[in-house]
Amino acid sequence: MAGKKKLLAELREKSTDELDAFIHENKKALFSLRAEVGLQNKAVKTHLFSMYKKNIARSMTVKQEKEGKIDG
């Protein structure tokens, strides 16, 4: 829980370009994990899938907050 709040605080401090770079890095990492699964690599850490997906979702939410697209 503390890690989630720390990550959100760090994401809110970043600029839009930095958020885009963070999203891109996480998408690349997620893609490489999927490629490893496709190659049937037995050493794939499956918990990383949800971690990367959640990081992407959180950063996109922060990006939308900055752009004022979230009703609240």
Swiss-Prot record:
Q: Entry's Pfam families?
A: Ribosomal_L29
Which keywords appear in this protein's UniProt record, sorted alphabetically?
Ribonucleoprotein, Ribosomal protein
What InterPro entries does this protein map onto?
Ribosomal_protein_uL29 (IPR050063), Ribosomal_uL29 (IPR001854), Ribosomal_uL29_sf (IPR036049)
State the Gene Ontology terms under molecular function: structural constituent of ribosome
Q: Name one GO cellular component term.
A: cytosolic large ribosomal subunit
A Gene Ontology BP annotation from the UniProt entry = translation
Cell division as a keyword of this entry, yes or no, is no
Q: Does the keyword Ribonucleoprotein apply?
A: yes
Report the family membership.
Answer: Belongs to the universal ribosomal protein uL29 family.
Name of the protein: Large ribosomal subunit protein uL29
Source organism (scientific name):
Chlamydia felis (strain Fe/C-56)
> Per UniProt, what is the name of the gene that codes for the protein in this document?
rpmC
